[in-house]
């Protein structure tokens, strides 16, 4: 797949539920889901043709929406995240977040992100959620701009079910988006259930480097401590001093 993370997420709609592995070549900006950069395209194609790659399975979440009219649940899925957000910009949405059939917290907010480990570096990350390594089999719950004392991110076990209820008294109705693409309107009184899927998404991998390297590279993280920076500054100052001395001589 040639493109950025959005293009890769669109391609995932075609491969989800199949045994076909997905490999992304980054033509966008961050490209967290991509395995190769554009300058390495020819080498990536050669390795694919030679079947010189490994397959990594990524957790996907299944989503079920119960609407207040009592009809059949609407089903969906997400590789990155399923997000319940307010439908009206000027008003908050009031929700109850629950885990395994038990309410955990109720608050007004802009929304709630329910993410996989893969999605922890996307919308959930920008909302203050933690980064989870891809092999972590868990579901992340991150409130968006919640007006509450207890509205912290939650890391939920793989066998748990997360629910987000849009309260009947909510000033705004809601909208559910899966991976920022597939959208379902949520009238007041709707319930969204999110749980880990039994069908993971398969990604082709060319590199054996740990996820840590990808994290540092994609986010351009400063990995040199102050001691090393201080030593580097001192070294440059000493070099300038020696150069000045040579010029004076």
Kindly give the residue locations of the regions a language model identified.
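N-terminal glycine-/serine-/threonine-rich phosphate-binding loop
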Residues: 1-18, 42, 46
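A residue-level signal for conserved active-site and pocket-lining positions in enzyme catalytic cores
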Residues: 4, 26, 82, 180
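Short glycine-rich anion-binding loops that position phosphate/pyrophosphate groups of nucleotides
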Residues: 4-7, 30, 118-120
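Proline-centered loop/turn at the N-terminus of a beta-strand
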Residues: 19-21, 140
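Catalytic core of DAGKc-family lipid kinases
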Residues: 29-111
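ATP/nucleoside-binding phosphotransfer catalytic cores, i.e., glycine-rich phosphate-binding loops
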Residues: 84, 100-103, 151-249
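Short aromatic-centered micro-motifs
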Residues: 97, 119, 176
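Gly/Ser/Thr-rich active-site loops/lids in small-molecule metabolic enzymes
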Residues: 102, 106-150
């Amino acid at each position: 797949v040639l493109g950025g993370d959005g293009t890769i997420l669109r391609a995932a709609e075609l491969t989800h539920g199949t045994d076909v592995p997905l490999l992304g070549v980054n033509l966008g900006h961050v490209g967290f889901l991509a395995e190769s950069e554009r300058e390495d395209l020819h080498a990536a194609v050669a390795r694919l043709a030679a079947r010189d790659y490994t397959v990594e399975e990524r957790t996907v979440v299944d989503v079920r929406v119960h609407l207040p009219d009592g009809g059949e649940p609407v089903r969906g899925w997400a590789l990155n995240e399923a997000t319940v957000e307010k439908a009206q910009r000027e008003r908050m949405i009031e929700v109850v977040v629950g885990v395994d059939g038990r309410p955990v917290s109720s608050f007004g907010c802009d929304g709630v992100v329910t993410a996989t480990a893969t999605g922890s570096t996307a919308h959930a990350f920008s909302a203050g959620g933690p980064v989870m390594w891809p092999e972590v089999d868990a579901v992340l719950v991150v409130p968006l701009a919640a007006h509450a004392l207890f509205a912290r991110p939650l890391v939920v076990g793989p066998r748990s079910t997360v629910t987000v209820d849009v309260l009947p008294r909510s000033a705004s109705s809601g909208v559910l988006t899966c991976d920022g693409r597939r959208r379902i309107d949520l009238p007041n009184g709707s319930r969204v259930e999110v749980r880990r899927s039994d069908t993971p998404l398969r990604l082709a991998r060319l590199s054996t480097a740990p996820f840590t390297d990808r994290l540092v590279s994609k986010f351009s993280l400063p990995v040199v401590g102050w001691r090393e920076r201080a030593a580097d500054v001192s070294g440059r100052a000493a070099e300038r001093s020696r150069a000045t001395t040579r010029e004076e001589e």
